Every structure is written in C-alpha cells, then in structure tokens.
Regions:
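Alpha-helical scaffold segments that mediate packing/assembly in large oligomeric complexes
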Residues: 1-6, 10-70, 122
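A glycine-rich phosphate-binding loop feature that marks nucleotide/adenosyl-phosphate handling sites
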Residues: 29-33, 80-87
C-alpha cells in the first residue's frame, strides 16, 4: 500500500528534477536564441568579460548589466535584479556579501557602508548543484543574476494545457498480477529574452 501511494510523488519529484536540469543545461550550453545570437553575448550586454567568484564588485557588475538593459527601441527598462543563481560552494559567500553591513573600501576607509546590504531582503540566493554537475569537474562554473520577470523574462517553462504535475493512470492487465502505470508530463523550455539574466563565467571551485 505504501508503494502505491508513494509512486505519484516519486515521479513528480523526478519530473521536476529533470525540468530543473534542462533549465540549467540551457544556461551552461548558452545556445543561440531567437535573434541568432547566443543567449549570453556581448551583443546582448548580459555577459561579464572575465570570470570570477561572487564578490561585492562582481555582483554589482552583474546587477548593472540588468539595470542598463534597453527595450528594442533603445529605451531604458532598468530590469530589477531579483535572483542570484550560484553553484554549490558560493552560498556562504553570498551570505557574507549581502549580510555584512560595514566593509573596508580602498580609498574610502574602514567601516564603510556596504552598498549591497540594502539588497539582503531583495535578492534571493539560489544555490544549485546542477550547475556544478553540468559544468564538469575542474571547469569554471558560471553564476547568474536574474531579474524580476515583471521587467524582463529569461527562461520560461511551459506545460501542455497548464498541467504542471505528471498525469498518472493505473490499470490492471487481465491474467497478470499487479498494476500497470502510465505516467506522463509534457513541457517545453524556451529562452524568451536575454534582457532578464546576466552571466559571470565564474571560476573553478
């Protein structure tokens, strides 16, 4: 009985994990999108030139990429940063960056206000192990800053008929003990806009 009741939950979890991996694979693979240019590219103004670990300076640089974005007519849209997506290993560092109120700044002095402290309740840090796995051992692991989708989108997951959980059908086959399970879920992942996300190529961890 326990197995029968657990099966739907197990498959739902597996489906979500698969979708999650496919989303991050797009971020890692950096494919060409609707305009024929890679998702992250200098032409899109959403790519940091040299990779580095998250720091106050590198996080500010990625956030500014979003804030400097413009619409197709060249008007500023100032995409508000909302998510910082980092591989496992940077979560503690991000806590230090956002939760430290006072820092030492060269040319200004010690006990200087941390400009990012005000974002501690505005930015959501997502520490994702799929980035580590997909980047591969010994390789630089990128990290990302994504904006509020009210201003600009980035990747979008769509489900057939809006069904976000697997459909499960259980049946019995005559002459055979046990059950037959039909379990399915239809989805698609699209990079709908480059303006809603910025990439730092990162470094090895």
């Amino acid at each position: 009985v326990g197995f029968i009741t657990e099966v739907p939950g197990l498959y739902a979890t597996s489906a979500k994990r698969t979708i999650n991996k496919q989303v991050y694979k797009i971020l890692i693979d950096n494919p060409a999108i609707f305009d024929g240019v890679s998702l992250f590219d200098n032409a899109h103004n959403n790519l940091i030139a040299s990779g580095a670990a998250p720091s106050i300076d590198t996080l500010q640089a990625a956030m500014l990429k979003l804030l400097h974005q413009t619409d197709p007519f060249g008007d500023s849209i100032m995409v508000e940063p909302k998510y910082v997506i980092v591989p496992v290993g940077y979560g503690f560092k991000m806590s230090q960056i956002l939760e430290t109120a006072m820092i030492d700044v060269t040319g200004i002095g010690s006990h200087t206000a941390n400009a990012l402290y005000q974002y501690r309740n505005k930015l959501q840090v997502i520490e994702e192990g799929a980035l580590n796995v997909l980047a591969g051992s010994g390789n630089a692991i990128p990290w990302f800053v994504a904006g509020d989708q009210r201003y600009a989108k980035s990747l979008q997951v769509d489900y057939l008929n809006g069904q976000e959980t697997p459909t499960i059908r259980r049946s019995e086959v005559p002459g055979r003990l046990g059950f037959v399970w039909d379990i399915w879920l239809d989805w698609g992942i699209t990079a709908v806009d480059f303006r809603g996300i910025a990439k730092n190529p990162g470094t090895t961890i």
